[in-house]
């Protein structure tokens, strides 16, 4: 360790720099000690130990912070990659199970379903029913008010897209509905939907079909009875 104003250092400094340096440190109350290191190339390295030690501490802290941050980012990326892989495998296992639909129909039907969705959006756009006077001018009709209502604007595009997928991708659509009922919707909601479907099917379709069948059967009986009576009357006349 040598003093900054040692002869070995002063000899290497030009006069102008020497005067400037001496003036700088003579104004300070404490003169720091400077460490001189000789390099094999002949250059000398001047450093203040206190400053070098402080910089080393900052460097070590920065390296530790960088390492911790790098490890956390790597763990986060690995965790997200595993989650994405799990979700892809879940979709393949539960929804996209039909190989033919996945390879041949999924891409074109997806575009067709997107087109059906935007068709529904166009059909329910208020500006197309007299509100903006683009296609149909004048006061909106009742049908136009119905088509441009908020429920229609929400339900019709989804219905058209869902119908398209259900028509051309029956296996994928049915698996999607089953997966949503099993893993997404609450149990009570799923039960209510199934009960409503069962009630609609039993009280609606089945009972209606039964009523129509009974009416047709009675009408057939009446028609046959009238035909028989007519034939009997004709025979009696002969």
Curated annotation (Swiss-Prot):
Residues 125-141 are mitochondrial matrix. Residues 1-103, 163-238 are mitochondrial intermembrane. The chain crosses the membrane at residues 104-124, 142-162. It is a multi-pass membrane protein. GO terms for cellular component: mitochondrial inner membrane. Keywords: Membrane, Mitochondrion, Mitochondrion inner membrane, Transmembrane, Transmembrane helix. It is found in: Mitochondrion inner membrane. Its main location: mitochondrion. Belongs to the apolipoprotein O/MICOS complex subunit Mic27 family. Component of the mitochondrial contact site and cristae organizing system (MICOS) complex. Component of the MICOS complex, a large protein complex of the mitochondrial inner membrane that plays crucial roles in the maintenance of crista junctions, inner membrane architecture, and formation of contact sites to the outer membrane. This is MICOS complex subunit MIC27. The lineage of its organism: Eukaryota, Fungi, Dikarya, Ascomycota, Saccharomycotina.
């Amino acid at each position: 360790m040598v003093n900054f104003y040692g002869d070995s250092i002063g000899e290497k400094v030009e006069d102008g720099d020497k005067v400037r340096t001496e003036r700088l440190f003579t104004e300070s109350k404490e003169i720091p000690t400077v460490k001189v290191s000789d390099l094999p190339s002949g250059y000398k390295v001047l450093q203040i130990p206190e400053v070098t030690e402080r910089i080393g501490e900052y460097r070590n802290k920065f390296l530790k912070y960088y390492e911790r941050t790098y490890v956390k980012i790597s763990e986060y990326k690995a965790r997200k990659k595993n989650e994405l892989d799990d979700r892809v495998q879940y979709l393949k296992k539960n929804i996209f199970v039909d190989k033919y639909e996945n390879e041949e129909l999924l891409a074109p039907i997806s575009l067709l379903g997107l087109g059906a969705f935007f068709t529904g959006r166009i059909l329910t756009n208020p500006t197309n029913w007299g509100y903006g006077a683009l296609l149909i001018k004048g006061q909106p009709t009742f049908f136009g008010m119905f088509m441009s209502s908020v429920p229609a604007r929400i339900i019709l595009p989804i219905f058209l897209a869902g119908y398209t997928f259900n028509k051309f991708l029956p296996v994928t659509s049915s698996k999607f509905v089953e997966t949503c009922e099993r893993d997404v919707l609450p149990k009570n909601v799923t039960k209510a939907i199934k009960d409503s479907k069962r009630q609609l099917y039993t009280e609606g379709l089945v009972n209606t079909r039964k009523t129509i069948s009974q009416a047709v059967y009675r009408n057939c009986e009446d028609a046959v009875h009238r035909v028989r009576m007519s034939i009997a009357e004709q025979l009696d006349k002969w």
